[in-house]
Amino acid sequence: MEINPYLMFLNNDVTSLISTTYPYTGPPPMSHGSSTKYTLETIKRTYDYSRTSVEKTSKVFNIPRRKFCNCLEDKDDLVKPTGNVDISSLLGLAEMMEKRMGEGFFKHCVMEAETEILKMHFSRLTEGRQTYDWTSERNMPAATALQLTVDAIKETEGPFKGTTMLEYCNKMIEMLDWKEVKFRKVKTMVRREKDKRSGKEIKTKVPVMGIDSIKHDEFLIRALTINTMAKDGERGKLQRRAIATPGMIVRPFSKIVETVAQKICEKLKESGLPVGGNEKKAKLKTTVTSLNARMNSDQFAVNITGDNSKWNECQQPEAYLALLAYITKDSSDLMKDLCSVAPVLFCNKFVKLGQGIRLSNKRKTKEVIIKAEKMGKYKNLMREEYKNLFEPLEKYIQKDVCFLPGGMLMGMFNMLSTVLGVSTLCYMDEELKAKGCFWTGLQSSDDFVLFAVASNWSNIHWTIRRFNAVCKLIGINMSLEKSYGSLPELFEFTSMFFDGEFVSNLAMELPAFTTAGVNEGVDFTAAMSIIKTNMINNSLSPSTALMALRICLQEFRATYRVHPWDSKVKGGRMKIINEFIKTIESKDGLLIADGGKLMNNISTLHIPEEVLKFEKMDEQYRNRVFNPKNPFTNFDKTIDIFRAHGPIRVEENEAVVSTHSFRTRANRTLLNTDMRAMMAEEKRYQMVCDIFKSVFESADINPPIGAMSIGEAIEEKLLERAKMKRDIGAIEDSEYEEIKDIIRDAKKARIESR
């Protein structure tokens, strides 16, 4: 039988079909499986872009160590990205930046950061998400990983009494010199027991908390390991990317560096970090307007919406070390030492390769995973694609980690890399001055906009090429294919579109306009508050807002199957509602959820419909809607709002509490969930209670109710009620016995049906 797709239009109204045309309404694709391939690709790219073969054996780990700074060999290929940083150029750019911002700019920023760091409590490290835990060698929540590290200090040396971030940092540096580190580890022991009845042997796995210890060399590698995962939820990309999470030994030092970089970013007008939202838009607007003030009458500007290719692979920790040394040159010795630790640790990092590579035979009938530590042994089984990835890196791999002295992994030093990017935007030299050209722009991590200013087109070309050359010196590669230039005040920056002023990207907010599905009372009020917010942010014009309101209304009615009382729409729910409406005189006071009409318009978006219709309601109807004793009435302080991108927004619930503010409950039994272990424990507890009660009859113990199916629960309840009625005298003994017999028969039937 053929399926005609146009049949879809017969049974659905237009507004419900909008969701089929809009691609952002579904969840983004998740990545699953092994992340080894993506990690190997990242490492191989980092080594390729270094454009050098200068290597020296590392004294600590005895692995060849590639040099990533001041040693560019392949200078011909101008298209391929370069990650080789020229340190003297970098320091020159930092000096220009300080001159422009005023003498002592860096010193002042570091002093601000220092006062904050000295007060900082080390529990701030629990704020992160997933963190690599070096004791169990897998990812854990940040708070757990921190606790396990503190436990390791306790096992080796005694309790950790520090409270501030500095004391924690000092302890981490001490730890790197310890000859042996002890830590807690959960091990599973297999216990064998003989069953007395059958005589068979039963194996049970018992988790036991033990204490493990590792030597100095092994601990160093674990401390410097960065775990990798595949990035989740990326739209419009076929290939996945690897993201990284460092361990709890590197975290405190990177936190300190980011604090210093944040203080600098706050004062740079070209930086898009760390502010966000409307504040960010205002900051960018001032940068654009100040550009117009700097231009002469014969000059004009071109906007380049830029894209940097392979930002992370071309960032070098050695370059960061030099930059931080320059930033802290006039500061205290404490800050000089603290800021140098994080880049040095990243210069010696090991990257965890993940689960391994999956193989299948030619018929695709069998699958096997080669674990990361055994890849060298079985490389003859790999496909060509994997072999070409693995063989150049073989000399850097130790067990399941790979030594990577250069390159950053995704999401490490966002603020510091912004400082590095802004330093190129501050560049000025004699040749540019002579031609009457200059540039400025905006930078936010790897995203940037360039405003090139000159008096004629050939000079504009020259200026842009000059900018590209300056960037190449410090490992920033502007992608010439993906960047595009346009007329003044037309650009895109961090998903914000600018055309004289910021134009909203309404597509991202569309899913929030739809019915949230909480309940009839909250849904429409929540949608109205979102439309109101978007009108305040200049995202919606009045006519578009009115259209959005009408679409919300249509979808609300389609979701809850409630249509206007005079629409003559037939349906199971409308039958009941129409009977109820006949009893009401003033039909203007009906709520939308009871078959009423829309009373709100753009000027009354902030007023809930219950308030507007309050005066027009019949007294009887009003008392029924706003009845505090009604069991359905319930109020939530906040409401979750879903968006196409970014996290779920939690907003204040402005809805008026009425009979429609009900909360639906899901009925789930424990039997089909992962609570079975809990149930087994409860049964054991019940057994112990019964034994105890049989010995000590006067003991006051509350025995657990135990696991019950719904059928058993109903029987138990009925018996209890019948007994209570008999005690009061509402029913006689003969009736009580009859009820007991009926329940016994039902129980028997239920057990037999199993």
From Swiss-Prot:
Segments for region (Promoter-binding site): 251-258
E.C. designation(s): 2.7.7.48
Post-translational modification: Phosphorylated by host PRKCA.
Enzyme class label: transferase
Phosphoprotein found in the keyword field: yes
Main localisation: host cell
Listed GO biological process terms: DNA-templated transcription; symbiont-mediated suppression of host gene expression; symbiont-mediated suppression of host mRNA transcription via inhibition of RNA polymerase II activity; viral RNA genome replication; viral transcription
Reaction catalysis annotation: RNA(n) + a ribonucleoside 5'-triphosphate = RNA(n+1) + diphosphate
Subcellular location: Host nucleus; Host cytoplasm
PROSITE patterns hit by this protein: RDRP_SSRNA_NEG_SEG (PS50525)
Residues spanning the membrane: none
Molecular function in Gene Ontology: nucleotide binding; RNA binding; RNA-directed RNA polymerase activity
Subunit structure: Influenza RNA polymerase is composed of three subunits: PB1, PB2 and PA. Interacts (via N-terminus) with PA (via C-terminus). Interacts (via C-terminus) with PB2 (via N-terminus); this interaction is essential for transcription initiation.
Family: Belongs to the influenza viruses polymerase PB1 family.
Protein name according to UniProt: RNA-directed RNA polymerase catalytic subunit
Organism: Influenza C virus (strain C/JJ/1950)
Top-level taxonomy: Viruses, Riboviria, Orthornavirae, Negarnaviricota, Polyploviricotina
The encoding gene: PB1
